[in-house]
Amino acid sequence: MKIITAYQEFKEFRNSIKSISFVPTMGNLHKGHMALIDKAKSYDSHVSASIFINPLQFNDASDFNNYPKSLDDDIALLSKHGCDSVFIPDSSILENIKEIKAPDTATYLCGMNRPGHFDGVLTIVNKLFEITKPTRSFFGKKAVSYTHLRAHETPEHGGMR
């Protein structure tokens, strides 16, 4: 499995791949994530995951600081399940990032209790999509609200991919 940490390197690597199934994660992987990897493998020849704990989606610094980190185990698990590459960017991915505002429907989801959460999710997913240019992307059931919001993203931000 290829491990890539620099986003420019991933962009260059992406040019050599015809199609890619992409599974964005924040790490601390479990069987639900592996089910997504397995599903992604059934579609394309190349499966890539990302691991990035996104500070933009935490409105409480202690939640971000206490988020579980299991990078070595995550890499081993992805490799065991046949993931072809993993993109593990550092915080420089956030430099000059285009901020995406969640639509008003976010307040009807859990956004009411987590101000800014969906803005942060949409912002990083948009950035990851700009870099990885996935043919397909896979999100778990927990992320249904993310895909709903992504589908309603405004055209000037790239819309749904």
Feature names for model-found ranges:
Residues M1-K18:
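Positively charged, low-complexity intrinsically disordered leader regions
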Residues N65-K69, D74-F138:
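Divalent-metal (Mg2+/Mn2+/Ca2+)-assisted nucleotide/phosphate chemistry catalytic cores
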Residues K41-S62:
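ATP-dependent adenylation/pyrophosphate-handling site
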Residues T25-A40:
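Di-metal (Zn2+ and/or Mg2+/Mn2+) metal-binding site signature of metallo-dependent hydrolases
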Residues G159-R161:
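Hydrophobic alpha-helical segments, chiefly the membrane-spanning helices
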Residues N28-L29, G140-Y146:
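Active-site glycine- and acidic-residue-rich loops that bind
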Residues K18, D44-S45, G82, K133:
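Residue-level detector of structured alpha->beta connecting loops
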Residues T147-E156:
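Conserved small/polar residues in nucleotide/adenosyl-binding loops
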